């Protein structure tokens, strides 16, 4: 189900990361990052593949050492999706990552080094057709900006961003994506809104950094990124969670799906239950969700606890069930198509899902 009036999108310059387009009106790109030892190429590749299966269009991998660089070469060669090298402190590792096959670099203005080192990275990336994300972070700003007491945190993030974008573009390098991350949602909103106004042509990578554990991080990311995306701001996104990285892409896709920006797999519509509910709805909804998780068809599936929330309120669902005492009424777009016993609800609903997909 998409919005009848699509959300406005700021038209930024297109940047290509391997075969994936960021900006220029392309769909919002979903990213995540591995947490394995990059020197262990096979373990990292296993996680990259799991992230791709979970919905990542691009995956970022940290390259902190020379040993990691060797593993990174294998990862780039065998990955099913474009790989981004995350670089801090050592510009030579950035150059090595380009040579190893990185589709994009992420560098941090606060620790990459002086302009000569930055220029060496720009030149290497330019020669290889490798994109670069200028990844500004509130916790590691350049010292001269961090010490400015007359600036707010969002203003500091914007100042660092503008400085680096200008330097890159003055050098003729325009294959850039920009991020300005903080753990505060309010700071994130102010910074990205300002960047969208001040540097409207550069694609923006959205994220709330250090967002927290699964529940807290999901809430903060959904609020911060959802607001920005609803305003047409953002070309790619990463939901950061203190959790298995595979937990991140479904949250990102959920945000995009909630706004009607992208669809991936079924959307589950289920009620919170009340005194009218006469079945144990929670495990039914959970089982339906679990059994649908590997389906790719963009269907709307409703699991409702009573007739009030059934075919009427969920009439736009492709398929659904309205549960009553010991039974469930199956419906499609508001029309009853069958009645089943309570213990057969999930199997019957899944059979109808499979039938609908086969018919399509």
Provide a role label for each language-model segment.
Residues 25-43, 62-64, 81-89, 144-158, ...:
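Active-site mouth loops of central-metabolism enzymes
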Residues 57, 100-115, 231-245, 323-336:
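Glycine-rich phosphate-binding active-site loops on the catalytic face of alpha/beta enzymes
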Residues 66-87, 120-132, 194-202, 288-292:
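Alpha-helix-loop-beta-strand connector modules within alpha/beta enzyme cores
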Residues 92-133:
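Hydrophobic or amphipathic alpha-helical targeting/insertion segments
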Residues 136-137, 145-296, 300-303:
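Catalytic alpha/beta core domains of metabolic enzymes, predominantly
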